[in-house]
A protein has these predicted regions:
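Short glycine/acidic-enriched loop and turn motifs that connect beta-strands
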Residues: 43-46, 90-91
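Beta-propeller blade repeat segments, especially FG-GAP/WD-type strand-to-loop junctions
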Residues: 47-66, 98-103
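Short beta-strand segments
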Residues: 4-6, 53, 95-97
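Beta-propeller fold detector
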Residues: 6-8, 64-69, 108-113
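N-terminal "first-domain core" detector
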Residues: 1, 17-31
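Acidic, small-residue rich beta-repeat scaffolds with periodic aromatic anchors
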Residues: 80-183
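Acidic/hydrophobic-patterned starts of short beta strands in beta-sheet-rich repeat architectures
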Residues: 29-41, 79-87
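Repeat-based blade/solenoid architectures
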Residues: 8-23, 68-78, 92-93
Length: 183
């Protein structure tokens, strides 16, 4: 049997390593029907995001896919052939993104950003949602139900409170903060 040695050199620094039980994933991330190898790099930065080194399985062994490593807190949406990402930018800003795998390179398809409007009346917290930089809604113009139907509900365009966004590491979500839970 042939053996391939994969050399991984830690980059980026300041990673908090995860336990060995949650270090490795063997799952198809380029949607070719063949499982690929993911190695968790640990938690990074003050927002605690997780990343993975990615090695795509080929006829000749494993080939590194460095663009996957840039995807924070990944989840796999096999049905739509997307890699999903969610993270906290800061205390008053969150983002969700969809990536497509094109020729074994992961490319940002679209990004939803939730930010607090710093210029709004100080008596009211106003949230603003944008997709790829274009405003799609504001909490001072939409009801709670309309906001849920716009981005949160399972049947909304984004469905960010839905199961498809559950992360590889701990099956958590940003919307309920379970993304920060221990697996």
């Amino acid at each position: 049997e042939d053996t391939q040695v994969i050399h991984v050199e830690a980059a980026g620094g300041y990673g908090v390593w995860v336990s060995v039980e949650h270090k490795f994933e063997y799952v198809d991330v380029n949607f070719d029907g063949i499982p690929d190898l993911l190695i968790c790099t640990g938690h990074h930065g003050n927002q605690g995001l997780l990343t993975y080194y990615c090695f795509l399985q080929t006829e000749n062994g494993f080939a590194e896919a460095p663009t996957f490593t840039e995807i924070a807190n990944p989840a796999i949406d096999a049905q739509n052939q997307l890699i999903l990402s969610q993270w906290r930018n800061d205390a008053a800003s969150h983002s969700w993104a969809e990536y497509r795998c094109q020729d074994d390179t992961y490319v940002l398809y679209r990004e939803l950003c939730e930010d607090m409007d710093e210029d709004a009346d100080a008596d009211e917290v106003v949230w603003v949602w944008t997709v790829n930089g274009q405003e799609i809604g504001r909490s001072d113009e939409l009801s709670g139900e309309e906001i849920d139907d716009l981005i949160y509900n399972e049947n909304s365009e984004w469905g960010i409170a839905g199961d498809r966004w559950r992360t590889l590491y701990n099956h958590g979500l940003t919307t309920d903060y379970s993304i920060y839970s221990t697996p």
